[in-house]
Regions:
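Transmembrane helix-loop-helix hairpins at the membrane interface
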Residues: 161-278
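Alpha-helical transmembrane segments in multi-pass membrane proteins
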Residues: 43-104, 110-123
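N-terminal membrane topogenic signal
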Residues: 34-50, 210-211
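Transmembrane helix-loop junctions in multipass membrane proteins, especially transporters and channels
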Residues: 66-71, 102-107, 135-139, 143, ...
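Juxtamembrane helix-loop-helix connectors linking adjacent transmembrane helices
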Residues: 74-80, 107-183, 199-208, 275
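Structural signal for the C-terminal ends of transmembrane alpha-helices
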Residues: 96-108, 129-134, 244-248
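Short, Lys/Arg-rich, polar N-terminal cytosolic tail immediately upstream
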Residues: 2-5, 13-40
Length: 278
């Protein structure tokens, strides 16, 4: 009498995520050169490159204006190499990198309509905070002669960026750059990437929006430093966008809030002439 056949076990399925996940499970540090390490590097580039291109183009433009040569003076009269023209180049590089690299591929299904109103509220609050130093009643309360400095900065910025100086097409490109390109690039860099990357290079192993006080405050501080003389409102803005990101766990909510702030500032400077914020 033949023994009954014992069914063989079903073949094991590969782990979700493909070979990279098989090489290193979530939470396990990736070995240098491993598939997981390469995947993390690609994700880091997708999050950081648009913002870094923006900063690089901005620094190159500033360096261009510092070169004391007759060639530079002649080139400054060319529209493409004016401040507004250089800003258009920044915008094209940043927006092109965003569309090419698509960092949102690492945040599938993150946006929820319920986050629209909180994001717009945060954006409006940050706008009010940002624009407050330019208000006349606030200038009278400053313990230093801030009003004169603001007026000087406004006059210099108006000469570079106002539609009367640049034309409406370049002004519209500037609005696109500040209201969409850099707003989105900054949130994918500061909140979606750096908040986690300062804790581990394997940043995708950390859940989106996970709160970690030291990294949260550090990122807000560096975000503030990026904004130079407006570091104080910059720090508070970094806290506001960061809190929204942590509470919603949605990078799109932070992007929308940042875009709302910048677009409101664009409308504000056009209506009031406070070009120092532009």
């Amino acid at each position: 009498m033949n023994a009954p056949e014992v069914p063989s076990p079903p073949p094991s399925e590969p782990p979700a995520g493909g070979p990279a996940a098989a090489a290193a499970a979530p939470g396990e540090p990736a070995r240098r050169g491993s598939p997981k390490a390469r995947a993390m590097t690609r994700a880091a580039v997708r999050h950081a490159a648009p913002f870094l291109l923006w900063i690089g183009a901005m620094l190159a433009g500033q360096l261009f204006h510092l070169v004391p040569s007759s060639a530079t003076e002649e080139a400054a009269s060319v529209d493409l190499l004016s401040d507004a023209g250089l800003y258009a180049v920044q915008t094209a590089l940043c927006l092109g990198a965003l569309l090419l690299l698509r960092p949102w591929r690492h945040h599938p299904g993150a946006f929820r309509p319920a986050h629209v109103l909180p994001a717009l509220a945060v954006g409006a609050a940050v706008f009010a905070l940002w624009a407050l130093p330019g208000a006349e009643f606030w200038q009278g309360l400053l313990p230093w002669d801030g009003g004169r400095d603001l007026a000087k900065a406004a006059a210099e910025a108006e000469a570079r960026y106002a539609p009367a100086a640049t034309g409406w097409p370049l002004f519209a490109v500037h609005l696109l750059g500040t209201g969409v390109a850099i707003a989105f690039a900054e949130e994918f860099f500061w909140r979606a990437y750096l908040l986690r990357a300062v804790r581990t290079p394997d940043f995708l192993d950390i859940p989106v929006g996970a709160f970690h006080a030291p990294s949260f405050l550090a990122v807000a501080a560096v975000f503030a430093a990026e904004h130079g003389s407006l570091a104080v409102p910059g720090f508070l803005a970094g806290l506001a966008y960061g809190i929204l990101f942590v509470r919603t766990r949605d990078v799109w909510a932070a992007c929308l809030a940042h875009a709302a702030t910048n677009l409101a500032l664009g409308a504000y400077v056009l209506a009031t002439g406070h070009w120092e914020f532009w």
